[in-house]
Amino acid sequence: LFGYLTGMATALVNMPTIVTASLAASLVPVISEAIAQKRGDVVMKRTDTAMRLANLITIPAFVGMCVIATPISAMLYATPDAGPCIAVMSFGVFLLGVQQVTTGVLQGMGKTAIPFINMVISASVKVLLSWNLTALPAWGVLGAAWATNADFGVAAVLNLIFLYKYRRYTMDVLHTVKLFVAAGIMGAAVLGAYHGAFSIIHSNTLATLAAICVGGVVYLTAIVVIRAVKPEDVQGVPKIGPKLAAAVEKLSFKI
């Protein structure tokens, strides 16, 4: 059973956060330079942009994985049994993204010990929860999955507390709520598209792929319609950032 968690669910959770990990790594020298120049405004702007971009990616990934976790498990691993673990671990995508970005900012500020200490604390929480939750028959391996989410969440919250302490930085709540609304609309569309496609073609793989495509279109449309994305939010995306920013600006103007 733990193979479903460590070999399947965890691997899927780490895929979307590859982008946020790269984003966090790129933040370190940028923040360090701004700190050296005593440009607090640049630190805040870079931090906010990075967090908005990370959430733009991780929130829909979390919702998408959660609503069609079992079909994804069946498609990738030829078994639906990893579905519950994937559904629970999907929450960790968003939390891990926040942790990675805030860690990058703190390291860039020269506070390298803080994220390390926070990770030690969060890891201790994970061990404690895993020890207790997995022993419960009703939880089992899902207890370990929730403990992993708690690990990411505790580290993310502690990092945010220190960012507020040193820079008075807080996440843009309205922007985050808008992204969750857009992702919720997408999640409903994904679920409906999967069941609709499966009832017609009777193929889990094709129905899952169709649902993912529908979800992508719906999410992109939703974030533009409800103004959850601005050109500057996607400007920093490697290679395609300027084109994405121009497209968002044109679409926003038309709507």
Give the positions of each predicted feature:
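Membrane-embedded alpha-helical segments of multi-pass transporters/permeases
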Residues: F62-V67, M75, V88, V127, ...
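Membrane-interface helix-loop junctions in multi-pass transport and translocation proteins
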Residues: A113, A123-V157, A188, G192-C213, ...
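Membrane-proximal transmembrane or re-entrant/amphipathic helices at the cytosolic face
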Residues: G192-I255
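Alpha-helical transmembrane segments
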Residues: Q99-G110, L160-T176, F198, V229-E232
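Hydrophobic residues within alpha-helical transmembrane segments
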Residues: L12, L56, V88-F91, I117-V125, ...
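Specific pore-lining/lateral-gate transmembrane helices of multi-pass inner-membrane transport
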Residues: L5-L95, V105, K111
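Short alpha-helical transmembrane segments in multi-pass integral membrane proteins
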Residues: R46-C66, I72-L76, L142-Y166, L179-F180
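Membrane-interface junctions at transmembrane-helix termini in multi-pass inner-membrane proteins
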Residues: F91-I121, W131
